[in-house]
Curated annotation (Swiss-Prot):
Binds 1 [4Fe-4S] cluster. The cluster is coordinated with 3 cysteines and an exchangeable S-adenosyl-L-methionine. HAMAP family: RNA_methyltr_RlmN. The gene is rlmN. InterPro entries: Aldolase_TIM, Methyltransferase_A, RlmN_N, RNA_MTrfase_RlmN, rRNA_lsu_MTrfase_RlmN/Cfr, rSAM. Its EC number is 2.1.1.192. It comes from the Bacteria. It catalyses: adenosine(2503) in 23S rRNA + 2 reduced [2Fe-2S]-[ferredoxin] + 2 S-adenosyl-L-methionine = 2-methyladenosine(2503) in 23S rRNA + 5'-deoxyadenosine + L-methionine + 2 oxidized [2Fe-2S]-[ferredoxin] + S-adenosyl-L-homocysteine; adenosine(37) in tRNA + 2 reduced [2Fe-2S]-[ferredoxin] + 2 S-adenosyl-L-methionine = 2-methyladenosine(37) in tRNA + 5'-deoxyadenosine + L-methionine + 2 oxidized [2Fe-2S]-[ferredoxin] + S-adenosyl-L-homocysteine. This is Dual-specificity RNA methyltransferase RlmN. It is an enzyme of class 2 (transferase). It is found in: Cytoplasm. Specifically methylates position 2 of adenine 2503 in 23S rRNA and position 2 of adenine 37 in tRNAs. m2A2503 modification seems to play a crucial role in the proofreading step occurring at the peptidyl transferase center and thus would serve to optimize ribosomal fidelity.
Length: 382
């Protein structure tokens, strides 16, 4: 466990929350905007560096507040430019954050939980069990750390982080309030100013919270589908037993229709050799998604030890994609990035204190550091 100070962590407060905080300590609400800019635009964690605040206010803030992000354990850089940070959160567990540069975009993949309770059979994170929800400060803190690493100001045109996907460790909708607060900061011009179309939340299908999400925030939605029929999805994504496909897809349709503006649902489908990659599975997907505005992202399986699954051949992947194309769907195949530093989709594991198995040991599915020679470890921890 990481020791707490009892002070209010301003890093995870939205603008309205920060305004209320300043009112509670007898200060004007406009101070919230000043402090948010220092924190998120410039990566400042020292009140003394906030030059437009008077000394008395800086001293008051030092007495009752702090700006504290997760602790960086390691930062690895892949041969393809992908970066991965392993960060330690207050529970003592480690989670992972991945930055993927591609063309003129920079996508940050953010974790929402330490471990995951959903136990999807092909995902290394799920093999750890669940430890804890991340706080709002720990979720947005991953963006804060990455942005500081690049030394860029979010408002600039040449920003490093253009997109954020809640597709890291954990199920975001099972940490609803903290994830929503973090996404609000991401989209706030006083935070990171990221367009609502460029913030995406991925869910395995927590149906009640999909409806709640549509009421409070406008972000893009991705569904981790991975199977085109009930029996197979029950096997691969166990939450399907609680929220079957007809109920789940109806909720997704409601969400997309509320957004309007020609928004579509992203379907994520991990291809597993001999399991869900056959022509009949593609045909079933076409029928299943016939009346849903969507785009399909095929993800060839990224191996990890003892998974029991294999990546399909390139021919099998192309065949699956071609069938979906002929069925009228917009289909892409995700390029595997960061595989040499275990940063590819489905490989994020961190190090999680195993509470679901009621023991006091640590699960370490892999070493926190990459094997020698597999990646360049960054020396700059700022």
């Amino acid at each position: 466990m990481i020791a707490t100070t009892g002070k209010v962590n301003l890093l995870g407060l939205t603008q309205p929350q920060l305004e209320s905080f300043f009112e509670s300590i007898g200060e004007k609400r406009f101070r919230a905007g000043q402090v948010m800019k220092w924190i998120h635009h410039f990566g400042v964690d020292d009140f003394d560096a906030m030059s437009n605040l008077g000394k008395a206010l800086r001293e008051k803030l030092k007495a009752c507040a702090e700006i504290r992000g997760p602790e960086i354990v390691s930062e690895d850089i892949s041969s393809d430019g992908t970066r991965k940070w392993v960060v330690r959160v207050a529970s003592g567990s480690c989670v992972e954050t991945v930055y993927i540069p591609q063309g003129g975009r920079g996508t940050l993949c953010v974790s929402s939980q330490a471990g995951c309770a959903l136990d999807c059979s092909f995902c290394s994170t799920g093999k750890q069990g669940f430890n804890s929800n991340l706080t709002a400060a720990e979720v947005i803190g991953q963006v804060w750390i990455a942005n500081k690493s690049f030394g860029t100001v979010p408002a600039k045109i040449d920003r490093a982080i253009t997109n954020v996907v809640m597709m890291g460790m954990g199920e975001p909708l099972l940490n609803f309030d903290n994830v929503v607060a973090a996404m609000q900061i991401m989209m706030d011009d006083l935070g990171y100013g990221i367009s609502k179309r460029k913030v995406t939340l991925s869910t395995s299908g927590v149906v009640p919270m999909i409806d709640e999400l549509a009421k409070v925030i406008d972000v893009s939605l991705a569904l981790s589908l991975h199977a085109p029929n009930e029996a197979l999805r029950d096997q691969l994504v166990p939450i399907n037993k609680k929220y079957p496909l007809d109920v789940l897809l109806a909720a997704c349709k409601r969400y997309v229709s509320r957004l309007g503006e020609k928004r579509v649902l992203t379907i994520e489908y991990t291809l597993l050799k001999g399991v869900n990659d056959q022509p009949e599975h593609a045909e079933q997907m076409i029928a299943l998604l016939a009346d849903i505005p969507c785009k399909i992202n095929l993800i060839p399986f990224n191996p990890f030890p003892h998974s029991g699954y294999e990546r399909p051949s390139n021919n099998a992947i192309r065949r699956f994609q071609d069938i979906l194309h002929k069925g009228g769907h917009n289909v892409t195949v995700r390029t595997t990035r960061g595989e040499d530093i275990d940063a590819a989709c489905g490989q994020l594991v961190g190090q999680v204190l195993d509470r679901t198995r009621r023991s006091e040991r640590y699960i370490a599915v892999r070493e926190l550091q990459s094997e020698p020679g597999a990646a360049q470890t960054a020396s700059n921890r700022s």
